[in-house]
Amino acid sequence: MPHMEDNGSEKEQLFLQHIQNLPQERLDAIRGHPELVLKEIDEFTYPDGSGVRMCIGDVKGGFIVGKIRERKPKIMVELGGYLGYSAILFGNEISKIPGGRYYSLEVNEDYAKIAYELVKLAGLDEIVTIMIGKACDSLVELQQKLLHKDLGFQALDMVFIDHWKDLYVPDLRVIESLNMIAPGTLLVADNIITPGAPEYHKYVNMSPEERRGYQAKVRNVNGFDFIGRWDLIYKTETKEFEGVIRNKHRKDAVDVTECVGYAKKD
């Protein structure tokens, strides 16, 4: 995902113009059909020959869709929405779950506006909520929103992490500190190999005692209020993917982490 200071680019605006300038007949054909909107994104090519960047794609995306179908999460959150590809892909699956809601957190207002237009075009705007701002701030807002909206809210069912890599751990510690992770919560993190998220991979594979030491030593850039929860027991599996994407050979992996319980406190 783009860096926090990235205020958008001409490329993303070109893509939005492409969608807005589609013939009315084509717009009518894809409206309300998430799979056709995704196809439009997949097939779009910029003048320089490149495609829309930072999309989860059908291979890794299909793997995560399988997890959604298996777990049937009612509340799913993504960190890093970009132009809405994953929100449409995963939000479409969430729409099949009674009471399901998908929250997409995106720091860049320009990207979020484009994502909203695409989500609306896909007919998922009543399922997908796009929140603009730093993930740490939006997570606090979301927690209060869910507590107010649903008195029975306990924790998030599923979290998809795909934003700025050096914020994977700090923002996960925010989620932990807000008590939004409980046994059964599933964390799915993209780009573990390319471009790489080694600190996150290490963190979710730590024992509770190792995580307690880490949290005591490493200050969270999001603030002292978000030290994290060392007593959460995580079980992590890494799924590797390899193949050719737009004529480039790529290798990547997704970390799938489940909270399976609590460690006993001293």
Swiss-Prot record:
UniProt-recorded Gene Ontology molecular function terms: carboxyl-O-methyltransferase activity; metal ion binding; O-methyltransferase activity
UniProt-annotated binding residues for substrate: K165, N191
Subcellular location per the Swiss-Prot or TrEMBL entry: Cytoplasm; Nucleus
Record's GO cellular component terms: cytosol; nucleus
Cofactor-binding details, from the entry: Binds 1 Mg(2+) ion per subunit.
Stored InterPro entries: SAM-dependent_MTases_sf (IPR029063), SAM_O-MeTrfase (IPR002935)
Tagged with keyword Disulfide bond: no
Residue numbers binding Mg(2+): D162, D190, N191
Catalysed transformations (reactions): a catechol + S-adenosyl-L-methionine = a guaiacol + S-adenosyl-L-homocysteine + H(+)
Top EC class, one word: transferase
Gene Ontology annotations of biological process type: catecholamine metabolic process; cellular detoxification; methylation
Keywords, sorted A to Z: Catecholamine metabolism, Cytoplasm, Magnesium, Metal-binding, Methyltransferase, Nucleus, S-adenosyl-L-methionine, Transferase
Highest taxon, organism lineage: Eukaryota
Binding site for S-adenosyl-L-methionine: I56, E78, S86, E106, V107, A135, D162
Co-factor(s): Mg(2+)
Major place of residence: cytoplasm
Alphabetical list of Pfam families matching this protein: Methyltransf_3
EC number(s) from the headed UniProt entry: 2.1.1.6
Family per record: Belongs to the class I-like SAM-binding methyltransferase superfamily. Cation-dependent O-methyltransferase family.
Protein name as catalogued: Probable catechol O-methyltransferase 1
Annotated source species: Schizosaccharomyces pombe (strain 972 / ATCC 24843) (Fission yeast)
